[in-house]
Amino acid sequence: MREVISIHIGQAGIQVGNACWELYCLEHGIQPDGQMPSDKTIGGGDDAFNTFFSETGAGKHVPRCVFLDLEPTVIDEVRTGTYRQLFHPEQLISGKEDAANNFARGHYTIGKEIVDLCLDRIRKLADNCTGLQGFLVFNAVGGGTGSGLGSLLLERLSVDYGKKSKLGFTVYPSPQVSTAVVEPYNSVLSTHSLLEHTDVSVMLDNEAVYDICRRSLDIERPTYTNLNRLIAQVISSLTASLRFDGALNVDVTEFQTNLVPYPRIHFMLSSYSPVISAEKAYHEQLSVAEITNSAFEPASMMAKCDPRHGKYMACCLMYRGDVVPKDVNAAVATIKTKRTIQFVDWCPTGFKCGINYQPPTVVPGGDLAKVQRAVCMISNSTAIAEVFSRLDHKFDLMYAKRAFVHWYVGEGMEEGEFSEAREDLAALEKDYEEVGAESAEADGEDEGEEY
């Protein structure tokens, strides 16, 4: 089997994780107590969903995941929630003391006390796999735990499981909506390690997802549950080909191969279509061409950045439901003729498509309508640099006055780490600039430079 272990870190990671496992269970017909009436091979078997669930002799299906947090309140919600019987108690690891929105606490003082326990649990899960494919890591980089403990854990995973791929689903701070004053510090420090220790990182931001909920689902005041259920649909579409047998299957490592032209340029934009409420869906039939176009709309992007300001390097389209390759090819051909969607000149084809015949599932009583077909797009665009330049700008404003820095230094960090991380991001912005530059003109100029 090609198993995948999911790691959910900090409040955002755990709450997105809850939404994901809720959706996976519905998709596979697994009950909240882990029993799966439709499963004929009790106690093992080589079913496709075993990539995400392990089976006990008693026929119980246990998610291959760990939930980590430095304080107990969020994990306690899992311990008492609907799916409390689904998880093994050892998979839910919580500390007693919060990271207090401080990267240094999550990474140095409090984080390092808990990280060995986490790695121990992950080792147990890994030993339970026959052919571990990689890790999905869910965290946010604005807070203290997601950024600090998240990057610490990624660094340690690189040491222990060097060759395994690591996909990150990372919630970045939004341009307008902020939950902490020190978000820019935490994000810059954390991205510094995401750069080195993840293979693909899908960027999400709450504001963009809020806007999608408000605009497309007519929810006036979206809650985190609304946001997370939408994010869960994206993640479910990405992992569908690992969990179901499909026509055009896509492996975790395949994302890497097709989306990452240079190791550092691995921050992805994602979008999902159709995001549509039940009332509207009743009156519309959405064709493959329509949902494909809508996935490329700037308003559908799950991070606040405008793909029209950049160029696409590569793009992965994961269809599910009633979709045939002929429709996909036609839709992609149409996209290629659009002037607004520009590719870099050194990557002319740029599309990777996957199809999975399992139609999208929706959470009963949720906001999304049940549809026949859906598409999820993950794209590598130079426009994502906007997100970094926004963060860097906010970082610079605070760091120029050394505001709040003493909280980090007091937890054993050195001031040099701030400037090191900031320089790394400056280099990243420059990398994106160069990648998007026209290669034909560039050839003449840089003959003098040595590589």
From Swiss-Prot:
Protein location: Cytoplasm, Cytoskeleton
Active-site residues (renumbered): 254
The protein's enzyme class: hydrolase
Catalysis performed (reactions): GTP + H2O = GDP + phosphate + H(+)
Cofactor: Mg(2+)
Binding locations of GTP: 11, 71, 144-145, 179, 206, 228
Family matches, as Pfam families: Tubulin (PF00091), Tubulin_C (PF03953)
Keyword Nucleotide-binding: yes
Main subcellular location of this protein, as a coarse class: cytoplasm
E.C. designation(s): 3.6.5.-
Signal peptide location: none
UniProt superkingdom: Eukaryota
Keywords, comma-separated and alphabetical: Acetylation, Cytoplasm, Cytoskeleton, GTP-binding, Hydrolase, Magnesium, Metal-binding, Microtubule, Nucleotide-binding
Cellular component per GO, a single term: microtubule
SUPFAM superfamilies membership: Tubulin C-terminal domain-like (SSF55307), Tubulin nucleotide-binding domain-like (SSF52490)
Subunit: Dimer of alpha and beta chains. A typical microtubule is a hollow water-filled tube with an outer diameter of 25 nm and an inner diameter of 15 nM. Alpha-beta heterodimers associate head-to-tail to form protofilaments running lengthwise along the microtubule wall with the beta-tubulin subunit facing the microtubule plus end conferring a structural polarity. Microtubules usually have 13 protofilaments but different protofilament numbers can be found in some organisms and specialized cells.
Name of this protein: Tubulin alpha chain
Organism phylogeny: Eukaryota, Viridiplantae, Chlorophyta, core chlorophytes, Trebouxiophyceae
Gene encoding the protein: TUBA
